[in-house]
């Protein structure tokens, strides 16, 4: 319609307005007139109705106008004094009208001389698909364009716009492409649309197509042939805005971008508010670079013709062709990359064998990479369909995306996501959930997410997961019941969970591992993990590729124990002299140090026990107690096995430390005459060495000395020769970690001798006896 190009009613004179109409239609001023009862209509080519502000072609009408009104098509029913006629409204979509009024769209390169006219202005406007409707031959219902087959119009429009204006850029000959606009409606077509580089273009710059609709549910393009692609695009850019595609037959694919076998990529394309509904494969990207998809909507994914073939929502396929400029089909070309999705919606799979978001490359040498998804949701509405599948990909990132595997309950679990041979895959602030609920757990169950192959650096950061064990307390809290990495080359090292929650939001957030490296060549790595015993383990490795299992070097148990396979160096980073200590708070009051190991600045080692009341000092040449004549080494029931010394034992024998000093009385020596020397084997030695190999020992027997003294009427307890201890039965005791502090001890008693005192009595007895013999000899 051109009424928008004329002057607004009443704003200018009739002559000015008539002149505007004449210029826009390429007519003479005298061939245009205002419609009234005072004109002879057959003397003009077009008339302007000031009531409707529309222009009409006079055609074969004759006579003086009497009455007129618009019909439902917007044409004018005119009655003259001669007859009644239908005057067609002037519209560029009607080629017959355009021809009759002397105007038809011209490409800008053919009409530069008239660019200052209204016709030139119209030539620079977007191309409407309605301009090509006259090419349509299949019109089952003439009055319903939604029944027409628009294939001829679509093909003609694409062919027409691709060379709209010649341009020279970067020493290349290219052609500017005029956007094609679609009004609201459903446009059926039986053959796929094909977009590719205009043949007469040279250089690397691509032909850039743009299709604009009135909204993805208002403007709908519908392929109607079984197995048909809605469109294919190769070696070009294609922009889609506010337009929808709806499957009109079985086994169809929405969009195919790039070739899978030849270097014919789609590049720098931008889609905004674009929908695909009902296709077996929504969008297939064979070779795609540097493109953005904003608010795309892919839904109602249907079955492939063979249900063994996978249906897809959006899929990045394997490229098997050569690199740019190559000829060998070896898959050596760069794969799809630099792709951005903003708020995508991919949902509702009517096919069980379906993947909503797929990226699979030929191998890890040529991976799909640099794919970023911001927000959106990927929702199956079918518990058997996968939300995502990634294979041979690098640097694929999801930010705030919801992955929801929902639908009618099933009695087993199906994969929500699958990752194979991928590197640097990041899920940041995502939600990965299933609505399926199982009543029991089995180690053979399929877990929601599978990581396999040589996958590394799969990061789940601040995600929330819901698995089928939502109601099973034992199995609803950790990643091991949600993520299966048993067949990954580096097992659990293939992925990292950071600050994630599982099932209920009230469960504690979980971080599975922390790895810290030096900043140079990163070959010195400390890794923090928690093992199945609840120990915090610090391990170390010089490997940068997980080829060597890290060595555990330090651990902290869940009861506070510290374990290490190395040394502890206290104060090594302190340049100021001073004591360093380890304190033990063991009585439970959290304030009193019950024992301490301390080293002073001179190197003396202090061991304090019993709240500091007992202390031993390891000096430069002696081990000493801090209080004299108080502490013992061993006890009657817990003796020291052997004591190895170079010099004889020195004991205190200072007169100043003794009282009631006197000679050994004869009654003791008289009794000692009956003390025997004996030889024996130790029972403990027999238990270890056997009766034959156990050695003989000689000396005194405590009980025999006791009997000798008692038989002589002496109280053995008046003398320090014999010691006696007894004890009651005591059970084994343990610390809080289950370690034995003291073993079980049966009830018992023991007699012991102070051997040097016994020998002193023996020598006194022998001396007295010698003295008596000498005196006898002297007589």
Swiss-Prot record:
It comes from the Viruses. Residues 653-779 form the Peptidase S74 domain. The keyword Protease applies. GO terms for biological process: adhesion receptor-mediated virion attachment to host cell; proteolysis; symbiont entry into host cell via disruption of host cell envelope; symbiont entry into host cell via disruption of host cell glycocalyx. The keyword Protease applies. Keywords: Degradation of host capsule during virus entry, Degradation of host cell envelope components during virus entry, Host-virus interaction, Hydrolase, Lyase, Protease, Viral attachment to host adhesion receptor, Viral attachment to host cell, Viral tail fiber protein, Viral tail protein, Virion, Virus entry into host cell. InterPro entries: S74_ICA, WH-like_DNA-bd_sf. GO terms for cellular component: virus tail, fiber. One of its GO terms (molecular function) is peptidase activity. The record marks 653-654 as: Cleavage. This is Probable tail spike protein. It comes from Klebsiella phage K64-1 (Bacteriophage K64-1). The lineage of its organism: Viruses, Duplodnaviria, Heunggongvirae, Uroviricota, Caudoviricetes.
């Amino acid at each position: 319609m051109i009424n928008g190009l004329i002057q607004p009613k009443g704003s200018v004179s009739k002559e000015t307005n008539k002149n505007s109409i004449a210029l826009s239609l390429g007519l003479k001023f005298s061939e245009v007139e205002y419609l009234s009862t005072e004109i002879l209509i057959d003397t003009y080519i077009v008339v302007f109705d000031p009531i409707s502000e529309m222009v009409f072609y006079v055609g074969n009408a004759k006579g003086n106008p009497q009455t007129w009104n618009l019909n439902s098509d917007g044409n004018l029913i005119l009655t003259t004094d001669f007859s009644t006629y239908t005057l067609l409204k002037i519209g560029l979509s009607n080629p017959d009208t355009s021809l009759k009024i002397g105007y038809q769209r011209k490409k800008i390169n053919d009409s530069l001389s008239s660019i200052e006219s209204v016709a030139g202005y119209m030539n620079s406007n977007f191309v409407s698909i309605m301009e090509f409707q006259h090419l349509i031959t299949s019109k089952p219902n003439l009055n319903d364009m939604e029944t027409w087959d628009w294939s001829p119009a679509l093909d003609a429009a694409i062919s027409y716009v691709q060379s709209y204006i010649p341009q020279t850029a970067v020493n290349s000959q290219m052609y500017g492409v005029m956007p094609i606009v679609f009004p609201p409606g459903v446009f059926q077509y039986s053959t796929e649309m094909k977009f590719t580089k205009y043949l007469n273009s040279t250089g690397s710059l691509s032909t850039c197509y743009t299709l604009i609709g009135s909204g993805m549910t208002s403007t709908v393009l519908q392929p109607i042939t079984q197995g048909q692609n809605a469109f294919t695009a190769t070696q070009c850019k294609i922009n889609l805005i506010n337009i929808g595609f709806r499957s009109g037959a079985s086994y169809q694919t929405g969009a195919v971008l790039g070739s899978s076998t030849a270097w014919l990529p789609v590049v720098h394309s931008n889609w905004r508010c674009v929908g695909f509904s009902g296709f077996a494969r929504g969008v297939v990207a064979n070779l795609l670079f540097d493109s953005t998809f904003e608010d795309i909507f892919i839904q109602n994914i249907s079955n492939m013709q063979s249900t063994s073939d996978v249906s897809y929502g959006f899929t990045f396929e394997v490229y098997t062709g050569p690199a740019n400029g190559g000829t060998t089909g070896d898959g050596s070309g760069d794969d799809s990359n630099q792709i951005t999705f903003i708020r995508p919606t991919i949902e509702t799979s009517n096919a069980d064998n379906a993947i909503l978001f797929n990226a699979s490359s030929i191998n890890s040498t040529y991976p799909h990479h640099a794919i970023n998804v911001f927000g959106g949701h990927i929702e199956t509405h079918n518990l058997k369909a996968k939300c995502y599948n990634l294979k041979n990909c690098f640097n694929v990132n999801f930010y705030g995306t919801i992955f929801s595997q929902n639908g009618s309950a099933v009695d087993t679990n199906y994969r929500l996501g699958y990752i194979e041979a991928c590197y640097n895959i990041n899920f940041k602030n995502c939600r990965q959930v299933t609505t399926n609920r199982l009543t029991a757990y089995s180690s053979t169950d399929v877990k929601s997410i599978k990581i396999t192959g040589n996958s590394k650096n799969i990061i789940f950061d601040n995600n929330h997961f819901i698995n089928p064990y939502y109601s099973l307390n034992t199995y609803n809290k950790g990643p091991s019941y949600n993520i299966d990495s048993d067949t990954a080359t580096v097992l659990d090292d293939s992925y990292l969970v950071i600050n994630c929650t599982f099932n209920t939001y009230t469960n504690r957030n979980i971080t599975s591992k922390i790895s810290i490296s030096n900043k140079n060549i990163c070959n010195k790595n400390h890794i923090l993990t928690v093992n199945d015993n609840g120990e915090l383990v610090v391990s170390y490795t010089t490997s940068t590729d997980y080829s060597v299992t890290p060595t555990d070097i330090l651990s902290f148990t869940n009861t506070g124990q510290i374990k290490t396979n190395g040394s502890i160096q206290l104060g090594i980073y302190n340049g100021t002299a001073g004591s360093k200590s380890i304190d033990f708070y063991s009585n439970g009051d959290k304030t009193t140090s019950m024992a301490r190991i301390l080293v002073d600045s001179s190197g003396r080692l202090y061991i304090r026990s019993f709240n500091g009341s007992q202390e031993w000092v390891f000096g430069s040449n002696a081990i000493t107690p801090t209080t004299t004549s108080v502490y013992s080494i061993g006890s009657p029931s817990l003796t020291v096995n052997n004591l190895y010394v170079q010099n004889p034992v020195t004991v205190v024998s200072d007169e100043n430390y003794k009282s009631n000093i006197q000679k050994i009385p004869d009654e003791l020596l008289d009794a000692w005459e009956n003390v025997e020397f004996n030889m024996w084997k130790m029972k403990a030695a027999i238990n270890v060495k056997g009766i034959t190999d156990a050695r003989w020992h000689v000396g005194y027997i405590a009980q025999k000395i006791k009997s000798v003294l008692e038989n002589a009427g002496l109280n053995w307890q008046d003398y320090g020769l014999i010691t006696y201890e007894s004890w009651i039965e005591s059970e084994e005791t343990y610390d809080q970690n289950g370690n034995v502090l003291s073993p079980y001890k049966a009830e018992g008693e023991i007699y012991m001798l102070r051997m040097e005192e016994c020998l002193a009595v023996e020598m006194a007895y022998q001396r007295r006896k010698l003295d008596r013999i000498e005196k006898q000899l002297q007589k």
